[in-house]
UniProtKB/Swiss-Prot annotation:
The chain crosses the membrane at residues 12-34, 38-60, 84-104, 107-127, 146-166, 202-222, 224-244, 256-276. Its EC number is 2.5.1.42. One of its GO terms (cellular component) is plasma membrane. Keywords: Cell membrane, Lipid biosynthesis, Lipid metabolism, Magnesium, Membrane, Phospholipid biosynthesis, Phospholipid metabolism, Transferase, Transmembrane, Transmembrane helix. GO terms for biological process: glycerophospholipid biosynthetic process. Prenyltransferase that catalyzes the transfer of the geranylgeranyl moiety of geranylgeranyl diphosphate (GGPP) to the C2 hydroxyl of (S)-3-O-geranylgeranylglyceryl phosphate (GGGP). This reaction is the second ether-bond-formation step in the biosynthesis of archaeal membrane lipids. Belongs to the UbiA prenyltransferase family. DGGGP synthase subfamily. It is found in: Cell membrane. GO terms for molecular function: geranylgeranylglycerol-phosphate geranylgeranyltransferase activity; magnesium ion binding. It is a multi-pass membrane protein. Its cofactor is Mg(2+). This is Digeranylgeranylglyceryl phosphate synthase. It catalyses: sn-3-O-(geranylgeranyl)glycerol 1-phosphate + (2E,6E,10E)-geranylgeranyl diphosphate = 2,3-bis-O-(geranylgeranyl)-sn-glycerol 1-phosphate + diphosphate.
Length: 276
């Protein structure tokens, strides 16, 4: 067993980014910076939930990761599966304990999110489209958690909708990228059922829907600062163009990375709008 596997299996960079999105979500909701204690707790609750989710996902995804991600800790033997299971539960427990320090509502929201993460990894992930919706919903509620922690939704509500929509697109594109390994496992993902081309059209629909939804605050009278979202929308549209043009593994990988980047850039665009 490798000690570094306890960090590696959580995907710490992703967890830190998720925590940051939660923190920025609270700032988007308030239109200002909340007190330091809330910021720290939101960051930790979201990061620990993400860490637990990634770990339990690797536990249930062991067989497919032997094909698609052989370098990860479990398939390469750096950590045994039983240890990964208990480690994920420990991370969830610590996150819930910290959520209680925010509020009962924040605790309940975190509990629901953590249960969804477990169910996604255990049962929902192989289900065509339902698994995509589940993980996209978890991404969408990340900035919303920060808003709940400060007791105000504000622009964070629209941000959550956009994050959900673009992540549905990204999850479908990721399935297009992983078709080879999923076929060997016998998974029934959307690209396997519909074909890569039709799945790309579905992903494109959600990508374009994100762009449309991103302009809802403009109709509500949000100031010119909100137009910081325009470059993000262009990135999303370019990712859509790529996956419609070609559905090979390399192109799908590039497209999903662009969609992933757009999620984080959108948070900053909404933050600019909220602060201005």
């Amino acid at each position: 067993m490798e000690l570094r596997a306890f960090v590696e299996i959580t995907r710490p960079h992703n967890c830190a980014l998720a925590g940051l999105v939660g923190v920025l979500g609270s700032m988007v909701a308030l239109g200002s910076v909340p007190e330091g204690k809330i910021l720290i707790l939101v960051f930790l609750v979201v990061s620990l939930g993400c860490a637990g989710g990634n770990t339990i996902n690797d536990y249930f995804d062991y067989e497919i990761d032997r094909i698609n991600r052989p370098e990860r800790p479990l398939p390469r033997g750096a950590m045994d599966r039983r240890t990964a299971l208990w480690y994920s539960l420990f991370l969830f427990a610590v996150g819930l304990a910290l959520a209680l320090l925010i509020s009962l509502k924040a605790f309940a929201f975190a509990l629901l999110a953590y249960i969804t993460m477990f169910l996604y990894a255990w049962k929902l992930k192989p289900l065509p489209f339902i698994g995509n919706i589940a993980v996209a919903a978890l991404t969408g509620v990340t900035p919303l958690y920060g808003a709940i922690a400060v007791g105000k939704i504000g622009l964070a509500g629209t941000l959550a909708v956009c994050a959900f929509l673009v992540n549905v697109a990204r999850e479908i594109v990721k399935d297009i990228e992983d078709v080879e390994g999923d076929l060997k496992k016998g998974a029934k993902t959307l690209p396997i059922i519909l074909g890569r081309r039709k799945a790309a059209y579905v992903a494109a629909f959600f990508g374009v829907a994100t762009v449309i939804a991103s302009f809802l605050p403009v109709k509500a009278g949000v100031g010119v600062g909100y137009y910081a979202m325009v470059p993000v929308d262009l990135i999303i549209l370019y990712a859509v163009y790529l996956i419609l043009r070609n559905q090979d593994e390399k192109t799908a990988h590039r497209s999903q990375l662009l969609l992933k980047a757009s999620i984080f850039l959108a948070v900053f665009a909404f933050l600019i709008a909220a602060l201005m």
